[in-house]
Amino acid sequence: FLNLLSAVDVYFIRDDRKTAYLYYKNCAVKVTAKGIDIIDYIDLGGYVWKDQVIDRDFKKCRADKCDYKQFISNISGGAEDRIKSVESTIGFLLHSYKNLGYCPAVILNDEVISENPEGGTGKGLFVNAISHLKHTVTIDGKSFSFERSFPYQLVSADTQLLTFDDVKKHFEFERLFSIVTEGITLEKKNKDAIMIPFERSPKIVITTNYAIKGKGGSFERRKWELEFTQYYNQEQTPLKEFGRLLFGDWDEDEWCRFDNYMVNNLKGYLNTGMVSSTHKNLRKRKFIAE
């Protein structure tokens, strides 16, 4: 009976070097360096993964008074070059296309150097924002071990972002080299291993309170680092500043501003690529770590 069934080729829409797509309940949003277009699904010309569809509608609106835009300015110290760098990084993470020449892991760190770093600078909220647009799997960095059986069992073929959250001191970034540049092998209990090739594998984010050790071209080609200022702490929180929880307490209008801000960051990235900025303490932090 199975021999009588014909195979059907299913074409999934994928980002390419110049084009990115975001999928909402009511439409697909096509983003290029030149503009942002809303496309009806009937005109899309292919399939999308169910888990990659964002559970809200999209419409165009102004984004200049967006909570999250102000949050990005705050964690960037209000410096224009740092804001542009963070916004271009957002665009990079929203663009599912992976360039074989350069597709680094994004490493988020604190600007302030401390013997007992407390975090709370906004790294988690930064990743949380991306997760509201991209199918994200988060791994607890404190308990993660490369030696553990099936370390990536939560990852699937439609995962777009893999985050190692709050990794420990002396995290072995070198152990991720093959994932960053070659793809990821998924192993699950009692199932055959599946190799997700580089171009379809998730982009990588690492959040940490410590310097990621490593020297040489191999390390530099595989990482893109951002420092967040100590604008937020246990006393000064986003909740206290905005009077509502980011994401959790937003109404429809604020979600509209957020979506348009993020889509514009994606458009900006497709224009400029990743924008670098000066790091205040990153080199010093690495020297201490050595």
What are these regions (language model features)?
Residues 198-201, 216-289:
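Phosphate-sensing "switch" segment of ASCE/P-loop ATPases
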